A protein has these predicted regions:
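Cytochrome P450 heme-binding "Cys pocket" and the immediately downstream C-terminal segment
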Residues: 100, 335-337, 457-497
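Cytochrome P450 heme-thiolate "Cys pocket" and heme-binding signature region
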Residues: 395, 432-464, 489-494
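Cytochrome P450 substrate-recognition site 1
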Residues: 30-48, 57-150, 176, 180, ...
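Conserved cytochrome P450 K-helix E-x-x-R motif and the immediately C-terminal K′/meander segment
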Residues: 48-61, 65-67, 257, 356-396, ...
Length: 518
């Protein structure tokens, strides 16, 4: 979600007032230390004046001057940025535990049950327990396999709905974003909650309209991505000058009501089923764990259920659909890629059925398209910020405890040191390559690495690969009339996820046998 103009205006107005009061000269780095190189900060605002609407690009330009390890200040907080695979390895692998903490923000406090989720939780016993729970209970290979039918059913529904939209468009362009979000949200909702709460049931009504759920997700990404003055200039925290904290509290109450509804419904089903109860979704799994008082209490279950909501429904739905929209954008700009993908799909799958998950290992070019999209358009260009838990040093430079650490994976993915012609979309670069997206290859980190790596990456990767494969297999693709490949707008909009600024529209026509779409 883009930072709004009025938010920046209010922020700058506050800064101007403070500068007028203080009338101090520009600051400089403290003497007698070995901090990494970087631009001199201004009083109060630090280097925030150098950060534009696309921070990953602004910071990339600064790193060209100051190097792959750079010191900045955001307000009163020291920030270190790593912009190379070597720095990524240092922060995320070699010294992972040193930099495994998170900064304390108003959004983390008010939108995640006081830092109870895996994303914003400090590195403590709660985080380690939740992380272990994700790995062993929620995202085990067996658990993901048990949800495979859900993924296939929702992808089939996507093909059917997109075919109907194409028929209704009569050769005109079809907006894709809504279809992609509905598909990913349907998968994640059913896996986590057991059903699509934004979908009406027979004889009843939806717990939340799809547009309301979408709005709640947008609000989450806005509030977790804005420049909140109080986070960086603590003097103004209590004033809530921009009104963000008030909105965070309102969001929290709305999410809490929805979450209570989900928990009550699941608990009632357990009560009715009695001994015949069988867990069918991740909330059920969490509630079963709560039966053992030595493992989880209700408050912890509630917090961890919100983890599933916000890090899977909120995060998974949005990040997966954003990645797919970028992938399809690049394919439309590169017809030779579309041609190669079509040949591979026709050879492996044929034209009388949809692509199944079992087909993916036999579709290396499709896998390469997804990797290349993640290289050029990582959904979180600088990952979530890390925080140094203790003093550290790298390449002769000191990083004091309490320093906020950013890893610019967008810059690493565009670095000619690691990639030939990095600005070109070339899936072929991954054909025969062992480079993967699972956090072991520092040149390609769409999900991060180490202890803070996205816990749901395996599910997200399955969803993206399956849907991209079926989109390319099920339809012919073209740009809207009058739009050339060079004219397709590829501008970004920054936030917790960095999406296309303008939603993708394409001319689509079903090309498989009719029964596939029925």
């Amino acid at each position: 979600m883009d930072v709004t103009a009025w938010a920046w205006a209010s922020f700058l107005a506050v800064v101007l007032v403070v500068l007028t009061i203080l009338r101090r000269g520009r600051g400089s780095q403290p003497q007698g230390n070995r901090l990494p190189p970087g631009p001199k900060p201004w009083p109060v605002i630090g280097n925030l004046n150098l950060i534009g609407a696309l921070p990953h690009r602004s910071i990339h330009e600064l790193s060209k001057q100051y190097g792959p390890l750079m010191q900045l200040r955001f307000g009163s907080f020291p920030v270190v940025v790593g912009s190379s695979a070597e720095m990524a390895r240092f922060f995320l692998k070699t010294h992972d535990t040193v930099f495994a903490d998170r900064p304390r923000t108003a959004a983390g406090k008010h939108t995640t049950y006081n830092y109870s989720d895996v994303l914003w939780a400090p590195y403590n016993a709660h985080f380690r327990r939740a992380r272990r729970l994700f790995a062993t209970e929620l995202f085990s290979a067996a658990r993901l396999e048990s949800y495979k039918h859900i993924r296939h059913e929702e992808v089939s529904a996507l093909l059917r709905d997109l075919a109907a939209a194409a028929h209704g468009a009569s050769g005109r362009a079809v907006p894709l974003r809504g279809h992609l979000f509905a598909a990913t949200n349907g998968i994640i909702s059913r896996v986590v909650l057991g059903k699509k709460y934004a979908e009406k049931e027979a004889g009843g009504s939806a717990a939340m309209a799809l547009e309301d759920l979408s709005g709640l997700i947008e609000e989450f990404f806005l509030l977790n991505g804005v420049i909140n003055v109080g986070d960086f200039i603590p003097w103004f925290d209590w004033l809530d000058l921009q009104g963000y904290v008030r909105r965070m509290k309102k969001y929290s109450k709305k999410m809490d009501r929805f979450l209570e509804h989900v928990l009550e419904e699941h608990e009632e089903r357990r009560r009715v089923k009695g001994e015949q109860f069988v867990a069918r979704d991740m909330v059920d799994v969490l509630l079963q764990l709560a039966d053992n008082p030595n493992r989880l209490d209700r408050d912890t279950v509630k917090a961890l259920t919100q983890v599933c909501m916000q890090e899977l429904i909120v995060g998974g739905s949005d990040t997966s659909s954003v990645t797919m929209e970028w992938a399809m954008s690049e394919v439309l700009r590169n017809p030779e890629v579309l041609g190669k993908a079509t040949k591979e799909l026709d050879r492996v799958v044929g034209r009388d059925r949809m692509v199944m998950e079992k087909d993916i290992p036999d579709l290396p070019y499709i896998e390469a398209i997804v990797k290349e999209a993640m290289r050029m358009h990582p959904v979180s260009p600088m990952l979530a910020p890390h925080l140094a838990r203790e003093d550290a040093s790298v390449d002769g430079h000191d990083i004091p405890a309490g320093t906020l650490v950013l890893v610019n994976v967008w810059a690493i993915g565009r670095d000619p040191t690691y990639w030939d012609a990095p600005e070109e979309f070339r899936p072929e670069r991954f054909m025969g390559s062992k480079i993967d997206v699972k956090g072991q290859d520092m040149e390609l980190l769409p999900f991060g690495a180490g202890r803070r790596m996205c816990p749901g990456y395996s599910l997200g990767l399955k969803v993206v690969q399956l849907i991209v494969a079926n989109l390319l297999h099920g339809f012919t693709w073209g740009l809207p009339d009058g739009t050339t490949m060079e004219q397709l707008n590829m501008e970004e909009i920054y936030g917790l996820t960095t999406a296309r600024k303008f939603p993708l529209e394409a001319v689509v026509e079903p090309k498989l046998q009719e029964h596939v779409f029925s």
